[in-house]
């Protein structure tokens, strides 16, 4: 839904598919909004398993964007990398979460001009085992039963989303295929916040997509 929002709003879009070994730009010149998405890795992943993945390069690029004070939204792994770019240390989430579960806004979240539109609680997507670290200036805006850091604000222009408001049926099918249906069923039996493939496909993702659009519109019009 992030890409669709940018297309719908008529933005000029460039992308770097690091999983296809595309190189990051040398500068952030010409970029006014950086969205860093997720992946199966952690910020300190052993590169032998993912030779294309260079977290140090991604973090350095994000630090350039921070210094330039452009808009940044990090999603899942991108949220964790943003926290490291700010000097924090990512951490393992208390619970692994896969599926749709509610996030609850904190008092700070209810007061945040861009996030408060989510309401007190919002059903969002999840597919993670880690979470962003915190720094002295970080503000937790939303939590869930399984993870205390679902949305974190690092500055008025820089937000970390551990939750996936962008999920849609196509993305879910790709994620199920990547993890495997039997693996997910096994995880569902062993862990409290993992849904079955059938549950994942039955979820309605439209409301969270709408709320994501509202957030992105609010952020970029501030």
Regions found by a protein language model. Give the residues of each.
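Active-site metal-binding loops of divalent metal-dependent hydrolases
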Residues: 39-40, 79, 165
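Short, surface-exposed "cap/lid" segments of acyl-processing enzymes
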Residues: 1-5
């Amino acid at each position: 839904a992030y890409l669709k929002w940018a297309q719908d709003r008529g933005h000029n879009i460039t992308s770097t598919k690091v999983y296809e070994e595309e190189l990051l730009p040398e500068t952030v010149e010409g970029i006014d909004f950086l969205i860093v998405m997720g992946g199966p890795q952690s910020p300190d992943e052993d590169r032998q398993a993912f030779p294309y993945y260079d977290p140090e390069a991604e973090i350095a690029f994000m630090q350039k964007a921070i210094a330039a004070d452009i808009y940044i939204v990090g999603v899942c792994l991108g949220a964790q990398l943003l926290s490291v770019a700010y000097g924090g240390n990512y951490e393992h989430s208390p619970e692994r979460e896969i599926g749709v579960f509610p996030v609850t806004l904190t008092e700070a979240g209810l007061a945040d001009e861009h996030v408060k539109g989510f309401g007190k609680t919002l059903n969002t997507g999840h597919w993670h085992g880690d979470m962003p670290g915190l720094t002295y200036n970080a503000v937790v805006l939303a939590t869930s039963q399984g993870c205390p850091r679902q949305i974190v604000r690092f500055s008025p222009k820089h937000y970390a989303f551990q939750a996936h408001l962008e999920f849609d049926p196509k993305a879910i099918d790709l994620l199920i295929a990547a993890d495997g249906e039997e693996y997910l069923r096994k995880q569902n039996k062993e862990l409290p916040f993992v849904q079955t493939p059938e549950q994942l496909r039955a979820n309605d993702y439209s409301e969270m997509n709408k709320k994501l659009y509202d957030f992105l519109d609010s952020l970029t019009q501030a």
